Amino acid sequence: MQKSVRYNEGHALYLAFLARKEGTKRGFLSKKAAEASRWHEKWFALYQNVLFYFEGEQSGRPAGMYLLEGCSCERTPAPPRTNAGPAGARDALDKQYYFTVLFGHEGQKPLELRCEEEQAGKEWMEAIHQASYADILIEREVLMQKYIHLVQIVETEKIAANQLRHQLEDQDTEIERLKSEIVALNKTKERMRPYHTHQEEEDPDIKKIKKVQSFMRGWLCRRKWKTIVQDYICSPHAESMRKRNQIVFTMVEAESEYVHQLYILVNGFLRPLRMAASSKKPPISHDDVSSIFLNSETIMFLHEIFHQGLKARLANWPTLVLADLFDILLPMLNIYQEFVRNHQYSLQVLANCKQNRDFDKLLKQYEGNPACEGRMLETFLTYPMFQIPRYIITLHELLAHTPHEHVERKSLEFAKSKLEELSRVMHDEVSDTENIRKNLAIERMIVEGCDILLDTSQTFIRQGSLIQVPSVERGKLSKVRLGSLSLKKEGERQCFLFTKHFLICTRSSGGKLHLLKTGGVLSLIQCTLIEEPDTSDDDTKGPGHMFGHLDFKIVVEPPDAAPFTVVLLAPSRQEKAAWMSDISQCVDNIRCNGLMTIVFEENSKVTVPHMIKSDARLHKDDTDICFSKTLNSCKVPQIRYASVERLLERLTDLRFLSIDFLNTFLHTYRIFTTAAVVLGKLSDIYKRPFTSIPVRSLELFFATSQNNREHLVDGKSPRLCRKFSSPPPLAVSRTSSPVRARKLSLTSSLNSRIGALDLTTSSSSSSPTTTVHSPAASPPPHTAVPESAPADRAGDSTDMSPCRSPSTTPRHLRYRQPGGQVADSTHCAVSPASAFAIATAAAGHGSPPGFNNERTCDKEFIIRRTATNRVLNVLRHWVSKHSQDFELNNELKMNVLNLLEEVLRDPDLLPQERKATANILRALSQDDQDDIHLKLEDIIQMTDCPKAECFETLSAMELAEQITLLDHIVFRSIPYEEFLGQGWMKLDKNERTPYIMKTSQHFNEMSNLVASQIMNYADISSRANAIEKWVAVADICRCLHNYNGVLEITSALNRSAIYRLKKTWTKVSKQTKALMDKLQKTVSSEGRFKNLRETLKNCNPPAVPYLGMYLTDLAFIEEGTPNFTEEGLVNFSKMRMISHIIREIRQFQQTAYRIDQQPKVIQYLLDKALVIDEDTLYELSLKIEPRLPA
């Protein structure tokens, strides 16, 4: 009997365990049984050259194993199938993959396997093929042969290298030997030549010839080198490098100044306030200090390092490498990002802290430090916001003068891209906080302080000089000439308009403001604006004729004092129209908020704040709009980015109209759209109000209680009925039908709770404080309130004036609420028509029979009247504030006239709407009779004198006045659209911005004239006297607030042709030199013209600022962030910042000087024959005082 083969079972089981865990290939296969042609599914695991199979994947002991050494594996076709069984099963079996493992000797039955997928079968076959140990031995032998071959090659190379080394050493030895031989031969030759050399040196002719040759060679070399140097100096590359170096030098100076500003911020405010917060009675908490000065100290340390690096680079001049410095700065930008995000909150915390008197007193003490130079804390907090845009402009200029192959170019471009990303965020934050900083700056200028400006919800609208007419003496003023010095001096007021208040101040000689003791702060909710005061106080002719129709009246009715009247006089009709538009819009916003809140909440379950919040389009970001956290004057989030369609939609949203949005839109719409598109949108709103208004806005406009739908359909309101004999202009009223007399009155429970809501129009002959009460119907019994109210409601009889609309008709709209409290809501502003529409639409249940015949809720009529209101309101602002648009675009003017004429043909037009339309038509059609604006060309034609004056015969006062007159004429002739788009920096600047270029040309011509007149004198004393006279002219210009003229003269005196005349300057008196230093400090460009800005802030118009200061600001904004985002949205935050700058420029443009023209003086100032060009001036200067020898 043959014995069975023994094997080590324990080791086999261990190998099976390893195969389960680390096998080369594992998985389920079907194995064909030997005894029957049946297939059994087993779990196989291949480990090295042994194949194990298990009953299942979790089986611990193998069912069998196969030794694969010497075997082969090949694919076999599927075996033939019988027809038994379902067809689907046969198809499945045919699709399976079959292969067979064949063993080396005959008589051994092959192992037949199959799997479900062809890919798995191929992987198993490949793994079995590679499992042969014999194949691995063959591969190892091949590798060993290659290794031995490589070792032999290496040894051969080593031997060759040693041989080469020996050859080199031998050659070195040979070279040394040859050198020594050459030296010996040279010494031998030298000993053999002494006689011949002596002979040559002794020949004088040869010696002279050699000297001449040497001189000529040197001269030719020097000439050629000089030519090379001159060519390079004049080459574009050298010019580019000079400009690049100058940019770097300017950057170092600006960085030094910025570090100094941060040093003042940290050491003058942050650290002292930290110490104050640790005192026994701290005026401020440590948390507030941290909130105000977040990261300020870290930013200072960062820029100190950056500044030191810049100075170290200058030590290596002319090689200036800056890219690595920006590489150091870029990773620290997250510090700036935190500062930027905290900026708005920082100013809000500061405004709240200023309400603490102890803190405010301490802060004024810190701001009084001479190092602050009169600047406020919020100014220092804003400096870091402008630094990143400054870096971007510097990088733009550096890249413009950096060749494309320069080693720094890529690094500088990368730094610029990163800084631009942060700059966009910074511009948004600066735009959002502009209003807070403006309010705090005005509050700091007022000596007595003004707590209402510490309310961060106040939005600054407008400022300017107006003349206050004493109302008690109006009968005596008929003989006073308009613009007389006595009236202007005594009655001139600096007025500031905010969304909730109107401030009237006087300015002291030091530039500080003082609020009027009576009527200095007017709450707009208590004011009624009358554009054309009544004529009852004058027996002969009205004040409109007396003051040229430049006066308007504000009737103030405080709840705890007697009513009083403020009469103000505007410098021009255009200024009056602009003031009236802004004041009326602010009053509309506040009045309609209060009115709407009372009416709406009384008659509907939907409150006004809920109506705004429920419209997600007003506060939630979308693909075509993005909002900021700051609220506008209507308590709706300001727009940060938006498409043109969304901006036009906001302009025509009938629920509210924010005055700050409207002003920004009208200032900057040319950047992202055209006047024709804006007018087309207004025309669509008027002609098709329902199709032009978003559906969601219509739904919220008519938001009512859930069960009031049937009342909305039939237009009946049982609880409300409105009545006024003459509706307020543009304040839409409702009637029973469009052709009936429009009489509405508020009755019922609303009438009982808030008092009678009377909408009356005071005629031109009525008293401004007269109140006309319309009889109200008795309220229903279940809502009646007894007439005998509690005694503490003493204010129920106080009459307030609600919405007033843009019209020149004086009128009063009054309403009352319990306790005499004035309805001053913080909700969004809507027109009066909107308020009544919603109130009427949201009426309660049950209608008395008397109301069935009078239709008081016609939705279409309300929408039409409100749309007409909005169109006329926008057009009034547009025409009154931006008349240049229509003067320069006749097609736009004709289209507006056609639209207004179409409005006049509307049979349903209310009388006041008709009058407002006629006023706009009149403003468009007639020339402004009080327009005293002259153009420079007109003055040149008027100065046709036979002989011009000379410099000696003209006084300093005459020169200063006429220079001021010319500068202001040139300055105010610049249309505001030229400030958009940086046209003055483009190649076609003379075509795009002709007036800005003309202003620049006039500045240069006046400066050239000053320098030429000084250089015309041959003797030193005459030149010194001329310098002293021009300095006196500059000082008079300063007194006249002509800072452009000051800079014209000081820049002429600082020209190299005049500044180098040391002998002349020694003859100039010390007082004149000190005065000139004072003038130069005032108009210095240091710190973004900080001294000039502070001076302009403390002076009343008229004034002529330096235009370059504003152009620099606009360039900062334009370079720092694009007009459109990558998604194509308008950057409205940038538009807001541009609008603020244009508003400040136009403030100085619109107030004219009352200086008489002197043709002889003007002809002298404009005579170009007296001007000497720059090169001739310098040559003349060298003749007068030649250069001293070195």
Curated annotation (Swiss-Prot):
Location(s) in or outside the cell: Cytoplasm; Cell membrane; Endoplasmic reticulum membrane
Phosphoserine: residues bearing it: 725-726, 736, 745, 749, 801, 805, 925
Post-translational modification comment from the UniProt entry: Phosphorylated by CDK5; down-regulates RASGRF2-mediated RAC1 activation. Ubiquitinated upon interaction with Ras. Ubiquitination leads to degradation through the 26S proteasome.
GO molecular function, one term: calmodulin binding
Residue ranges occupied by any IQ domain in the UniProt entry: 205-234
Chain intervals for the UniProt region annotation (Disordered): 713-744, 757-826
Keywords assigned by UniProt, alphabetized: Calcium, Calmodulin-binding, Cell membrane, Coiled coil, Cytoplasm, Endoplasmic reticulum, Guanine-nucleotide releasing factor, Membrane, Phosphoprotein, Repeat, Ubl conjugation
Protein name: Ras-specific guanine nucleotide-releasing factor 2
